[in-house]
């Protein structure tokens, strides 16, 4: 079932339609808003530029986490195969 959730990002309200719970959407929005605020504090940026830089930073974090996950899976497989 799709839920409509209103969130506030960079002082603007947005309605998000998702199958996720409203609580989960609010959690995501709070995280994104906090990251946008951190980026906006370091430089004078338009809201659009702050959103772009936030997206780039979050994508960087995601890709690094995926790389680390892959590395740990390989390490675990190596350990398991050594025990067989």
Which residues does each predicted region cover?
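Helical coiled-coil/dimerization "stalks"
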Residues: 2, 15, 23-31, 41-42, ...
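Amphipathic, hydrophobic secondary-structure cores in small proteins
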Residues: 11-27, 33-57
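Residues at alpha-helix boundaries and short interhelical turns
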Residues: 43, 63-66
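Heptad-repeat coiled-coil/leucine-zipper oligomerization helices
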Residues: 48, 54, 58-61, 68, ...
